[in-house]
Amino acid sequence: MLSMTEPVTAVHQYIDYFNTGDVKAMAAICADPMQILDGLPPHVWQGPTATEDWHRDVMVAGEREGATDYFVTLGEPWHVDVTGDSAYVVVPATMTFRVHGKQVTQSGSIFTVALRKLAAEWRIAAWAWAKGTT
């Protein structure tokens, strides 16, 4: 029987690692190749170092803009589809961060994730972040 919860658990792990700043753990839960689509330029990151490259670019942009303390909270999944060794998860999300010390909340974001089951573990193969409103 296919488990609908295992891919969602992997998505939550990835976000938990992001929230604690554990980039190596974020990368370890990803498939190779990995793809990221985000609102931050250059908007697309691909390959075995996609997560590390994306995180570095987020931190550089944050430093330039005075943004710190990023934290993502995921809601209940809107969509979970598991077919064999592939899964697709769509989750509403809220991101909080500080800009020059002022708290900002970005609500209504959508985190869409494609996963592959490799060696009995769900790995994130791609994700896209659709920005909400601040």
What are these regions (language model features)?
Residues 96-105:
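Short, cysteine-centered beta-strand-loop-beta hairpins and adjacent loop/turn segments enriched
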Residues 1-33, 123:
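Short, low-complexity N-terminal intrinsically disordered segments enriched in polar/charged residues
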